[in-house]
C-alpha cells in the first residue's frame, strides 16, 4: 500500500503524495468526495474523463438483463 503524509500549512490541511502517485502537473484543482473517514481526490471536472478514455471497456454482457421501466399509456390530449 502506498502511503501519503498529511500536514498543516497555514490554516489548511495538505497531503503530500509520493512521486509515483502524483497528479500530472496540468491538474490544478481537485474535487473531494467524503465517504465516512475516506477522502477521495479526483481532478475537478475530469472525474468521468478517465472512464471514457480508458482502454478497458465494460464487459459485453454489461446491463444485458436490466429491467425496462413500464410506461403507462397516457390519455390523448
UniProtKB/Swiss-Prot annotation:
Lineage: Bacteria, Pseudomonadati, Pseudomonadota, Gammaproteobacteria, Pasteurellales
Keywords: Toxin-antitoxin system
UniProt-reported outcome of changing residue 61 to A: Increased antitoxin activity for VapC2
Species whose genome carries this gene: Haemophilus influenzae (strain 86-028NP)
Keyword Cytoplasm belongs to the record: no
Main function: Antitoxin component of a type II toxin-antitoxin (TA) system. Neutralizes the effect of cognate toxin VapC2 but not non-cognate toxin VapC2.
GO molecular function, a single term: DNA binding
Family: Belongs to the VapB family.
Quaternary state and interactors: Probably forms a complex with cognate toxin VapC2.
Notes on the domains: The C-terminal 33 residues are required to neutralize cognate toxin VapC2.
Protein name listed in UniProt: Antitoxin VapB2
Highest taxon of source: Bacteria
Stored Pfam families: MazE_antitoxin (PF04014)
Residue span, SpoVT-AbrB domain: 4-46
TM segment ranges: none
KW Transmembrane (keyword) present: no
Amino acid at each position: 500500500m502506498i502511503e501519503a503524509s498529511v500536514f498543516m500549512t497555514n490554516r489548511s490541511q495538505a497531503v503530500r503524495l509520493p512521486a509515483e502517485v502524483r497528479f500530472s502537473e496540468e491538474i490544478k484543482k481537485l474535487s473531494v468526495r467524503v465517504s465516512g473517514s475516506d477522502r477521495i481526490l479526483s481532478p475537478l471536472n475530469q472525474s468521468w474523463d478517465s472512464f471514457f478514455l480508458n482502454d478497458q471497456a465494460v464487459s459485453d454482457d454489461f446491463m444485458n438483463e436490466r429491467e425496462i421501466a413500464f410506461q403507462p399509456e397516457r390519455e390523448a390530449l
